[in-house]
From Swiss-Prot:
CDD domains: DMB-PRT_CobT
GO molecular function: nicotinate-nucleotide-dimethylbenzimidazole phosphoribosyltransferase activity
Record keywords, A-Z: Cobalamin biosynthesis, Glycosyltransferase, Transferase
Family from the record: Belongs to the CobT family.
Name of the featured protein: Nicotinate-nucleotide--dimethylbenzimidazole phosphoribosyltransferase
Lineage: Bacteria, Pseudomonadati, Pseudomonadota, Gammaproteobacteria, Vibrionales
Biological-process GO terms, alphabetical: cobalamin biosynthetic process
Active-site residues, record numbering mapped to chain: 311 (proton acceptor)
Coiled coil (residue ranges): none
Pathway(s) where this gene product acts: Nucleoside biosynthesis; alpha-ribazole biosynthesis; alpha-ribazole from 5,6-dimethylbenzimidazole: step 1/2
Uppermost EC category: transferase
NCBIfam families in the cross-refs: cobT_DBIPRT, PRK00105.1
Enzyme nomenclature, EC number: 2.4.2.21
Length: 342
């Protein structure tokens, strides 16, 4: 858990800026959390918030459950989009470029491997895709454990290289099915409340998707977290959960994207509850399961734009709000320094 000895001092710094108490709303909460995180292990409160090297990690993986027709897109699209990310042509590339966010793609196991020596591609393949969880376990326990280790290693390396804020994105056809199954199995919420439209399926396809997800969830009752990850998890989702754990271990904040990334964050908090203190939430997505996981994490997202793209786009769009919180904390005058009396 975050050490709280500097919380009152940081709150005083915020309250003493030249504004009415609380007038900057949620930005004040963001500044408090960032300053508190950056005060961990220090002898005094952080009087300056550093956000100089944001890092987006985009985890890609394919899913055997795609064979059940739960998405309108074929698994080949995962590789095509990874190539698009590496070429700089996707929405996430546009938003990362706009805000000088470094983007790295992690191949956690996609059906069609990418033949590329791109500097921003990391290979941590656990296979070509998960097994079809509608009929068998998606992953082995060994794959789950390796995925968690992979995520921890990748995040730790980026932090060692200077990253002071992490953001995670994802790509994987049928990964909303895995995320919905994980959410239902881990939280006990009904499957039909966790399943959404993903790539834009119709009512008939949605009904089918709910039945498919329920088949996997039905095997999960009474299982441990790791066993549930093996039953219905995804390579990229579990790897991401490991990255969340490493971020907390290295006292680095993470700006959480949409539904799938939030499910990975939830998994990480079940494995390591202290992870929650390092999470800020970018947005509320259109996937209906996202509201459930936000409630479980007691999260108040910064934006509500009707997004349902994934890729980390919501996090990249919310990043300037974190910069704004740091800017007022670092540079806004106090009543005393400005000579303002109230």
């Amino acid at each position: 858990m975050l050490e709280q000895q500097f919380a009152a001092e940081i709150q005083h710094i915020i309250d003493n800026k030249t504004k009415p108490l609380g007038a900057l709303g949620q930005l004040e909460q963001v500044a408090l959390q960032l300053a508190l995180i950056q005060s961990q292990g220090k002898e005094q409160a952080a009087t300056h918030i550093e956000l100089k090297q944001p890092q987006m990690l985009l985890f890609a993986g394919d899913h055997g459950v795609a064979d059940e027709g739960v998405s309108i897109a074929p698994s080949a699209v995962t590789q095509q989009m990874v190539l698009n990310f590496l070429a700089g042509g996707a929405a996430i590339n546009c938003f990362c470029a706009l805000h000088s966010i470094d983007l790295t793609v992690v191949d956690c196991g996609i059906l069609l491997p990418v033949d590329s020596d791109a500097r921003n591609l990391i290979l941590r393949r656990l296979g070509s895709r998960t097994a079809n969880f509608a009929i068998e376990s998606a992953m082995t326990i060994e794959q789950v454990e390796q995925a968690l280790r992979n995520g921890q290693q990748i995040a730790a390396e980026k932090i060692a290289q200077g990253a002071d804020l992490l953001m995670f994105g994802e790509m994987g056809i049928a990964n909303t099915s895995s995320a919905a199954a994980l959410l239902s199995a881990l939280s006990g919420h009904e499957v039909d409340h966790c399943v959404g439209r993903g790539t834009g399926i119709n009512e008939e396809q949605l009904s089918h998707k709910i039945k498919v997800v329920a088949q996997g969830v039905g095997r999960c009752e009474g299982l441990s977290v790791n066993a549930i990850l093996a039953e219905v998890g995804g390579f990229e989702i579990v790897t991401m959960a490991g990255a969340f754990i490493a971020a907390a271990e290295h006292k680095t904040p993470v700006l959480v994207d949409g539904f799938i990334v939030s499910v990975a964050a939830y998994i990480a908090t079940l494995l390591k509850p202290e992870v929650r203190d390092y999470l800020l939430f970018a947005h509320r997505s259109e996937e209906q399961g996202h509201q459930i996981v936000l409630s479980l994490l007691e999260a108040k997202p910064l934006l509500d734009l009707g997004l349902r793209l994934g890729e980390g786009t919501g996090a990249a769009l919310a990043y300037p709000l974190l910069k704004a919180a740091a800017q007022f904390y670092n540079n806004m005058a106090s009543f005393e320094s400005a000579g303002v009396t109230v």
